[in-house]
């Protein structure tokens, strides 16, 4: 049986990276929320 998590840095960056977050309004909202919370890392 194939497992659900098949790590790939390329897919990780494309789906959850900073540029992907900035591309949508909802993504920018996530970044702002993480900044407000004082997160050390904002995105993958």
Swiss-Prot record:
GO biological process, one term: translation
UniProt keyword Ribosomal protein, yes or no: yes
This protein's UniProt keywords: Ribonucleoprotein, Ribosomal protein
Domain of life according to the entry: Bacteria
Gene Ontology terms, MF aspect: structural constituent of ribosome
Ranges in a coiled coil: none
Record-level GO cellular component terms: ribonucleoprotein complex; ribosome
Pfam family, one: Ribosomal_L34
Presence of keyword Endoplasmic reticulum: no
InterPro entries: Ribosomal_bL34 (IPR000271), Ribosomal_bL34_CS (IPR020939)
NCBIfam families reported in the protein's UniProt record: rpmH_bact (TIGR01030)
Family affiliation: Belongs to the bacterial ribosomal protein bL34 family.
HAMAP family: Ribosomal_bL34
Name the record gives this protein: Large ribosomal subunit protein bL34
Organism: Ruegeria sp. (strain TM1040)
Gene name in the database record: rpmH
């Amino acid at each position: 049986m194939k497992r659900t998590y098949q790590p790939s840095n390329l897919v990780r960056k494309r789906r959850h990276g900073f540029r992907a977050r900035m591309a949508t309004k909802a993504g920018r909202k996530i970044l702002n929320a993480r900044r407000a919370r004082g997160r050390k890392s904002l995105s993958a």
